[in-house]
């Protein structure tokens, strides 16, 4: 027997390791046998005259031998357990590596809660630019007249190969991150400290600019008087207020656009009532009251419930698996627990009379809630399911028959379904009818179809036909596709067919079974058929809880096979069927809206992130950064959905996701913001201290220019007298003759195009293709790869060297940077009046204003008007 077990074990993964173990074990057993034999001989020789002692010694030795055999078997089992454990670890590692949904349930629930999107507003205006002054003159003395200029607020363009296009893309993304859903100027307005009439100005930054300008010693009197006249204007008739704001033209255009395109809508009790799903609103078991009274200035941001535009169920197996698993974990929290069940001890006594061989009594006693939550949760989340059972346990197989009665085959894992169907056919149906065993054929899944053709008994054949043709219905409710059980299952009438089949099956001869075993099987089937009324009530209870919770699903339901499955023990199904009572349980009202809210928040966040990444793809494409940015864009999009681990998604699915996102049109607000930024690109470039508008090249050395605010520098602010050639046009055409000809004529030229001050690519890509004989002297004088502006800083606060003002030495250069003049700040031209509603209140969580109670006792199922369970 031991050797047979060993031959089986050699089929395991670590065959060589087991072989070594076997050799050691055989050697130990052989030595033990020889030792026992020697002991027997010694005992016989020494105790010839005492046969009783010899017998006792022999029994002792036999016991020792049996203990040794048991020890060897234990070692063998431990080896098997180790191998199985190692296999489990390997499988677990594979799942961790390739399935992004591998995480704890608590973490999934937490991430689901984090997906909530709050209405985005701000207490200050959006600004790309701010005001800056140059306080020192060229000779190091403080200026008597201060000049103020508009400068870029987030001027963080790094040196090197970083393109100005990438800078504008990051600038655009920054605008998208801060783009508000609504704006209320009244909340951000502050007092104007210099107002003659206690007026207000729009925000703190505008106030800071006022203070700096007012405190400037050289600010003229008419400017101070103008600042004292700045105040807000209120119109009570229209409930609007106008506030003065000090803004750059680009910021003014953006903020006015945000004010005109707010997402908020007026809020009334009707809006809240419309948020309640129609099915719940008309459910006789729930009473909804909206006690809050909302004023005319109440506002809310409607949820963004556009249906899945990517199609996660089609071609994204890893992502779909992660989403459905998260949905399953979330849905189970809201399925109610069964209460007032039948006494388990009494039921088990009846079942023990059937000589049932249950794998786990613990599962039998405590599995009813697990099975109840499992059935409802898997359909709500459209998860693939698998049933674990023991073929010899006919009570579990009968419970599986009930599961096949109410659950279509499309939701089962194919392998699990085939195994379950074969077990039911070969253990119950065919032996009852005296038919030969059905054998499995590779790839053949039509087990019950074949059985239907061979079975002549009408009730059994009707049940088989029902299982073969059972499918979920698809019902569109308020634009959302939901899975629906058939009418027979919803009303519980299908249990009559199930019960009739059980009675017909139990009355069959079971000719091939021994008499005791036959009676046990028939007793088990009769035990189930005697609970027909309770099973019918259970079916109605399952369907009612499912349909009630499914009304809270706001995303189309698609029944697609998942990579991982949810498993249930058949003994848990038996526990549910045998211990269910006539006590009705329905979802708690508070949990109902919590489930509804979590689904709304996820879909809203999902749509917002789609719009963001689509806008980013559009911007990257328009800025010629499409190829560089795609993988990063898609990865960031997936990670922002909270329930996915982006690095674990296979590359083919990421590329497919990229292609789907690329075909989605850009949302209007995001497209308009990009248009505003691109239309004002030149203005933004001029305000940056890190971006220049081109490079000046000369064959002969040129003296450095004198700039009032900077000093001697190789930065040129004026293009007069220079030939201008566009860098991008040269790169597109590939014709560099214009540059060569100009340099040969010793005519200074400007290669115009936005580049960083410090660069080693944008200019070099062009200059490296020019005739080296013409350009050699320029390269010799200055390293173009490290082109920087030469600024001789003359500053009394600086520890750098000083340049004597009357020094006759004039520095020269053959390269210079072309930088357009920054826009000078003029307060009278920079003040704009922004208008918004004077006062309104935005409500975020609308469901807290709905008071929901349940009717006791529970009235009826909303489908057919009959009671869910026949309570006594």
From Swiss-Prot:
Q: Which UniProt keywords apply?
A: Capsid protein, Inner capsid protein, RNA-binding, T=2 icosahedral capsid protein, Virion
Q: Which GO terms describe its cellular component?
A: T=2 icosahedral viral capsid; viral inner capsid; viral nucleocapsid
Where is the protein situated, by its record's location annotation? Answer: Virion
For this protein, what is any one GO molecular function term?
RNA binding
Q: Give me the ranges of the annotated region Disordered.
A: 1-57
Compositionally biased, Basic residues: which spans? 1-10
Report whether RNA-binding shows up as a keyword of the record.
Answer: yes
Q: Name one Pfam family in it.
A: Rota_VP2
| Recorded family membership | Belongs to the rotavirus VP2 family.
Query: What does the subunit comment say?
Result: Homodecamer; each decamer is made up of two conformers of VP2, called VP2A and VP2B. Interacts with a VP1-VP3 complex. Interacts with the intermediate capsid protein VP6. Interacts with NSP5. Interacts (via N-terminus) with NSP2.
Q: What is the name of this protein?
A: Inner capsid protein VP2
Name its species: Rotavirus C (strain RVC/Pig/United States/Cowden/1980)
